[in-house]
């Protein structure tokens, strides 16, 4: 589980609820079922109208990515690439065929399979980058979905406010109810703002971050696979791939190699 996402939502909602509780009216005035209906159902309906059904059905999956802790094991991948490079330099590319079953990453395995099969370097580069591009297009569907929802929620919040104001103006003779009616009219705007800025935008940004990290790992794999095919020195390959690591991961890689 990604504790940062859970803590972020918990602290955010907690801060809002505590702030509401300390108002003179308490929490009760901030709850209105019709406002929830307009904001949540209205924005979701518009989202469905503007998106593919397949994408909308995957909302639970996208939320799962938001709460999941993502680990890409870059150090382990680099170590495997260096080991494969060393073996290829000593025994030839065909000797790597026996090592393919030990590679768990499908993208990594398909790239090495192309190398062992003797595919042209440009063909390998094109195929792997095409697969990377398609992956990013799939990821973009999810982030764009929540980006759209973040735009729609405040709009429907304002719609609810306008509905409330129309109802308020239609009942001006009851002056004792003006204050409470105005409060109810504004609640939908509050709901829309909370949904957009605390719920949907963080999910969108997290999905974009996951896409960036995964694309970086796959780019690293592509460069490593092509270097193995071209017969680069394993130490040069290692130094090149270390540029994809953070200083902390570089230290981990150096210590693991030094301990072997």
From Swiss-Prot:
One of its GO terms (biological process) is chemotaxis. The keyword ATP-binding does not apply. It is found in: Cell inner membrane. Residues 204-260 are cytoplasmic. It is a multi-pass membrane protein. It holds the Pfam family MotA_ExbB. GO terms for cellular component: plasma membrane. The chain crosses the membrane at residues 3-23, 27-47, 152-172, 183-203. Keywords: Cell inner membrane, Cell membrane, Chemotaxis, Flagellar rotation, Hydrogen ion transport, Ion transport, Membrane, Transmembrane, Transmembrane helix, Transport. Belongs to the MotA family. Each stator complex is composed of 4 MotA and 2 MotB subunits. 2 A subunits and 1 B subunit are thought to form a single ion channel, so that each stator complex contains two channels. MotA and MotB comprise the stator element of the flagellar motor complex. Required for rotation of the flagellar motor. Probable transmembrane proton channel. This is Motility protein A.
């Amino acid at each position: 589980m990604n504790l940062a996402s859970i803590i972020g939502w918990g602290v955010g909602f907690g801060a809002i609820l505590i702030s509401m509780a300390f108002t003179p009216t308490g929490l009760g005035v901030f709850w209105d079922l019709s406002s929830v209906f307009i904001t949540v159902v209205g924005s979701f309906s518009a989202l469905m109208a503007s998106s593919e059904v397949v994408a909308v059905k995957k909302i639970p999956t996208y939320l799962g990515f938001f709460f999941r802790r993502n680990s890409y094991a870059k150090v382990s991948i680099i170590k495997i690439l260096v080991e494969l490079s060393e073996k290829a330099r000593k025994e030839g590319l065909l000797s790597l065929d026996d090592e393919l079953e030990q590679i768990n990453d499908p993208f990594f395995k398909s790239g090495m399979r192309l190398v062992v099969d003797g595919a042209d370097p440009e063909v390998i580069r094109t195929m792997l980058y095409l697969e990377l591009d398609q992956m990013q297009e799939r990821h973009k569907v999810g982030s764009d979905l929540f980006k759209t929802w973040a735009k729609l929620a405040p709009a429907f919040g304002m719609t609810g406010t306008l509905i409330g104001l129309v109802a308020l103006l239609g009942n001006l003779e009851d002056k004792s109810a003006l204050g409470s009616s105005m409060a109810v009219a504004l609640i939908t705007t509050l709901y829309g703002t909370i949904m957009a800025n605390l719920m949907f935008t963080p999910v969108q940004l997290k999905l974009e971050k996951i896409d960036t990290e995964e694309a970086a790992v796959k780019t690293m794999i592509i460069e490593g696979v092509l270097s193995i095919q071209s017969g680069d020195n394993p130490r040069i390959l290692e130094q090149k791939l270390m540029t994809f690591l953070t200083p902390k991961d570089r230290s981990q890689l150096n210590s693991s190699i030094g301990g072997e």
